[in-house]
Amino acid sequence: MNNSEQLRAIEFENIELTTIIQRLENGQYAIPVFQRDFVWDKSNIRDLWDSIYRHYPIGSFLIWETDEQLPRHRNILNIELKENSKGKFNYVLDGQQRITSIIGAVKGAKRNRTSFKLFFNISKAYEMSKKDLLDQISNSPFLTEKELKDSSSSDQVLPLEKLLDFDSAIYRNLSQINYDLSDYYLTISEKFRKDYKVSV
């Protein structure tokens, strides 16, 4: 393969959501300023995470690797991002709304007093897993912050970031409350952290 063919080569890899988040945070991925502003609302974000939970495809991300350093966004939804100052630069060309939604929900981002933090109703998800497919489709185990405040349910609800960053304290607390829920938590945590992959 000659040099110009190498420059045009298209490659892909399947990576975990946690890897995408880490690469954004540490500056390996950047969103160039020529991308449109973030326009999704909380329901779009919840629907994206619901698709991930159900293992539906959410499309691939197009990342452009180049030696050229371009102007980039230094924060996403008020989440400060590190800058990669050396080596190759990787810019998100397609998938910016989805990537922003993923990191915004996990990090509990806020913009203009709007919270993008999501919560996972593990009790509801566990009950849904025992029902038929039609019942599962019409329900979502994800809640926005407002929906959580408006809810009078005593279900076990966890911030989304706790599913991606396994916390044994949460597992121990759940196991004291309900063994089935704690076992299901392990399954769901693994599903979000390792089983679901996206092509970049």
Map each language-model feature to its residues:
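Basic- and aromatic-enriched surface patches that contact anionic nucleotides/nucleic acids
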Residues: 2-39, 46-200
